[in-house]
């Protein structure tokens, strides 16, 4: 940390295990010959004496044995190699890196599959050489769908302490990456705190800081100011950067008849520059030099969709797909320079138009990982856009999108707070997991099966612990049945003891076992007994109260 940082009051963050779980690690051999790799996971302890292990993004913040010192930052990962090129270059050379071995264990996949997907450009490992604090992860359609959480201050509200807290909070609930979209004061300092304390890759949009350097006037931006800003962020350790190099002058005119015009902040900045200067943007004309800078640090391109649709009316229009074609051309240039690249996508798209976006991206961009903001499936629900967008996110992820950028309830309304961040992450973890199930991703259904078994066996504490949000699941249950005996009761407050379908089913199975029958035979025998009982009472539907 810099001297300026050390003088800042240290933020407070949430630490400690998630209820019902503990932090655990596996030792994995390092293919580089360095120290063994310590791969983290979350272990859920079940009342049966068994356990269930989960992919974990929370870093040391859920490890009670870890010493958390935000001013000092997280301890660096040992054995980071800076002089052998990018993950893409090494994968193409046939090398399985330490990061690939780490990821293979986390994903439950062969390390060779990880290498091949990276070599083909279908997956990226965002891991700047200068960000050794991260736990390596992968973004690609062959792997689990990932979720990004946006944080960052604005000129109106928030502070460094709040953004650090949001970063730790988001990763606690499953954010796989973080984007710092700060546009207010202390952009460099805020980013430094986040980077030194983030266990997940950190992305940025460099044009925001470059704009601050010219006091918010897009027409004053230059290639030199932007380039120096990128290098500054590369030196700090940013893992991936959004670059709106596909916003061309001729495409800007295509947005004139849109309902919502250009809604991307970066896209609007570059559109303003192009119109003011009557030429193509410096991001486009200097893209090859930018590729060399990114490759030097192994920073991953996130080629931004500056012309994404901001309303259902504008979905899949000429401007959007024209930019996508240019992003495809740029992605090929980036890979020639050895830089990793993923493609950003929309936006606001009705459900019947979503799959077309994935198919076109895969065709034009050689299956580079697709990273989408939602998309929102409808425009009518401000304050609930974490839901409208999670619907679209599940559909687009099933079709092949590799990473989903979350949307919070505050989308279109204001800067998200801590609660909004959690709500957004949970909504998107649901969408990502639903897509993994639909795609047949290995291990995805194991968690569903474990929770369903616990539910059928009325192991309430296990249900809570296996859920995406254990504290909230427990809170909802305890609102009506708070007593401890209710944690083993064979009913909840929805149906009560008489109408619980699972209890009735369990009773049928007990009856079958007692009489040496299978379940169908038990049902038939039970129906026969009830029929006889009905006949004994004179075939009367209603009996006198005395009986």
UniProtKB/Swiss-Prot annotation:
<feature type="binding site">
    <location>
        <begin position="264"/>
        <end position="266"/>
    </location>
    <ligand>
        <name>substrate</name>
    </ligand>
</feature>
<dbReference type="InterPro" id="IPR025747">
    <property type="entry name" value="ThiC-associated_dom"/>
</dbReference>
<feature type="binding site">
    <location>
        <position position="244"/>
    </location>
    <ligand>
        <name>substrate</name>
    </ligand>
</feature>
<keyword id="KW-0004">4Fe-4S</keyword>
<feature type="binding site">
    <location>
        <position position="208"/>
    </location>
    <ligand>
        <name>substrate</name>
    </ligand>
</feature>
<dbReference type="GO" id="GO:0009228">
    <property type="term" value="P:thiamine biosynthetic process"/>
</dbReference>
<feature type="binding site">
    <location>
        <position position="179"/>
    </location>
    <ligand>
        <name>substrate</name>
    </ligand>
</feature>
<feature type="binding site">
    <location>
        <begin position="305"/>
        <end position="308"/>
    </location>
    <ligand>
        <name>substrate</name>
    </ligand>
</feature>
<dbReference type="InterPro" id="IPR037509">
    <property type="entry name" value="ThiC"/>
</dbReference>
<keyword id="KW-0408">Iron</keyword>
<keyword id="KW-0456">Lyase</keyword>
<comment type="function">
    <text>Catalyzes the synthesis of the hydroxymethylpyrimidine phosphate (HMP-P) moiety of thiamine from aminoimidazole ribotide (AIR) in a radical S-adenosyl-L-methionine (SAM)-dependent reaction.</text>
</comment>
<keyword id="KW-0949">S-adenosyl-L-methionine</keyword>
<dbReference type="Pfam" id="PF01964">
    <property type="entry name" value="ThiC_Rad_SAM"/>
</dbReference>
<feature type="binding site">
    <location>
        <position position="348"/>
    </location>
    <ligand>
        <name>Zn(2+)</name>
    </ligand>
</feature>
<feature type="binding site">
    <location>
        <position position="500"/>
    </location>
    <ligand>
        <name>[4Fe-4S] cluster</name>
    </ligand>
</feature>
<protein>
    <recommendedName>
        <fullName>Phosphomethylpyrimidine synthase</fullName>
        <ecNumber>4.1.99.17</ecNumber>
    </recommendedName>
</protein>
<dbReference type="Pfam" id="PF13667">
    <property type="entry name" value="ThiC-associated"/>
</dbReference>
<dbReference type="InterPro" id="IPR038521">
    <property type="entry name" value="ThiC/Bza_core_dom"/>
</dbReference>
<dbReference type="GO" id="GO:0016830">
    <property type="term" value="F:carbon-carbon lyase activity"/>
</dbReference>
<keyword id="KW-0784">Thiamine biosynthesis</keyword>
<keyword id="KW-0411">Iron-sulfur</keyword>
<feature type="binding site">
    <location>
        <position position="371"/>
    </location>
    <ligand>
        <name>substrate</name>
    </ligand>
</feature>
<feature type="binding site">
    <location>
        <position position="492"/>
    </location>
    <ligand>
        <name>[4Fe-4S] cluster</name>
    </ligand>
</feature>
<dbReference type="InterPro" id="IPR002817">
    <property type="entry name" value="ThiC/BzaA/B"/>
</dbReference>
<feature type="binding site">
    <location>
        <position position="412"/>
    </location>
    <ligand>
        <name>Zn(2+)</name>
    </ligand>
</feature>
<keyword id="KW-0479">Metal-binding</keyword>
<feature type="region of interest" description="Disordered">
    <location>
        <begin position="1"/>
        <end position="36"/>
    </location>
</feature>
<feature type="binding site">
    <location>
        <position position="150"/>
    </location>
    <ligand>
        <name>substrate</name>
    </ligand>
</feature>
<comment type="pathway">
    <text>Cofactor biosynthesis; thiamine diphosphate biosynthesis.</text>
</comment>
<keyword id="KW-0862">Zinc</keyword>
<dbReference type="GO" id="GO:0009229">
    <property type="term" value="P:thiamine diphosphate biosynthetic process"/>
</dbReference>
<feature type="binding site">
    <location>
        <position position="344"/>
    </location>
    <ligand>
        <name>substrate</name>
    </ligand>
</feature>
<dbReference type="GO" id="GO:0008270">
    <property type="term" value="F:zinc ion binding"/>
</dbReference>
<feature type="binding site">
    <location>
        <position position="495"/>
    </location>
    <ligand>
        <name>[4Fe-4S] cluster</name>
    </ligand>
</feature>
<dbReference type="GO" id="GO:0005829">
    <property type="term" value="C:cytosol"/>
</dbReference>
<dbReference type="GO" id="GO:0051539">
    <property type="term" value="F:4 iron, 4 sulfur cluster binding"/>
</dbReference>
<feature type="compositionally biased region" description="Polar residues">
    <location>
        <begin position="1"/>
        <end position="15"/>
    </location>
</feature>
<comment type="similarity">
    <text>Belongs to the ThiC family.</text>
</comment>
């Amino acid at each position: 940390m810099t001297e300026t940082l050390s003088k800042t009051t240290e933020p407070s963050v949430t630490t400690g295990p998630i209820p019902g779980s503990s932090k655990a690690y596996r030792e994995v051999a390092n293919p580089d010959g360095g120290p063994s790799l310590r791969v983290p996971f979350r272990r859920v302890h079940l009342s049966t004496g068994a356990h269930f292990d989960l992919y974990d993004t929370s870093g040391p913040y859920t490890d009670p044995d870890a010493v958390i010192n935000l001013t000092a930052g997280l301890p660096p990962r040992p054995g980071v190699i800076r002089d052998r090129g990018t993950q893409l270059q090494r994968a193409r050379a046939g090398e399985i890196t330490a990061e690939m071995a780490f990821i293979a264990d986390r994903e439950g996949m062969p390390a060779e599959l990880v290498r091949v997907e990276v070599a083909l450009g279908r997956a990226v490992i965002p891991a700047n050489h200068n960000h050794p604090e991260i736990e390596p992860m992968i973004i690609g359609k062959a792997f689990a769908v990932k979720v990004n959480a946006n944080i960052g201050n604005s000129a109106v509200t928030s502070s460094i302490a709040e953004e650090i807290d949001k970063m730790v909070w988001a990763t606690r609930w499953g954010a796989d990456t973080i984007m710092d979209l700060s546009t207010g004061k202390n952009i460099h300092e805020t980013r430094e705190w986040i980077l030194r304390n983030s266990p997940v890759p950190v992305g940025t949009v460099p044009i925001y800081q470059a704009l601050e350097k010219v006091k918010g006037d897009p027409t004053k931006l230059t290639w030199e100011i932007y380039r120096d800003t990128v290098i500054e962020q590369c030196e700090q350790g940013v893992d991936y950067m959004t670059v709106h190099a596909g916003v061309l002058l001729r495409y800007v005119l295509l947005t004139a008849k849109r309902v919502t015009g250009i809604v991307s902040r970066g896209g609007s900045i570059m559109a303003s520059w192009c119109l003011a200067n009557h030429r193509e943007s410096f991001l486009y004309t200097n893209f090859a030099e930018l590729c060399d800078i990114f490759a030097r640090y192994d920073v991953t391109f996130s080629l931004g969709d500056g012309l994404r649709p901001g309303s259902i009316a504008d979905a899949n229009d000429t401007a959007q797909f024209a930019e996508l074609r240019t992003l495809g051309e740029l992605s090929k240039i980036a890979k020639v320079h050895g830089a990793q690249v993923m493609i950003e996508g929309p936006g606001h798209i009705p459900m019947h138009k979503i799959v077309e976006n994935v198919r076109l991206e895969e065709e034009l961009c050689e299956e580079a990982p697709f990273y989408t903001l939602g998309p929102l499936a409808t425009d009518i629900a401000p304050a609930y856009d974490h839901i409208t967008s999670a619907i679209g996110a599940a559909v687009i992820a099933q079709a092949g999108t590799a990473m989903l950028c979350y949307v919070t309830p505050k989308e279109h309304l204001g800067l998200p707070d801590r609660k909004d961040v959690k709500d957004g992450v949970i909504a998107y973890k649901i969408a990502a997991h639903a897509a993994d199930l639909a795609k047949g991703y290995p291990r995805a259904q194991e968690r569903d099966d474990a929770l369903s078994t616990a539910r059928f066996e009325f192991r309430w504490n296990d249900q809570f612990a296996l859920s995406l949000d254990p504290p909230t699941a427990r809170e909802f249950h305890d609102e009506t049945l708070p007593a401890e005996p209710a944690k083993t009761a064979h009913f909840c407050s929805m149906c009560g003891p008489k109408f619980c379908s699972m209890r009735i089913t369990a009773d049928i199975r007990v009856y079958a076992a007692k009489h040496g029958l299978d379940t169908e035979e038990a049902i038939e025998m039970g129906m026969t007994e009830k029929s006889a009982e009905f006949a004994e009472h004179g075939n009367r539907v209603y009996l006198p109260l005395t009986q």
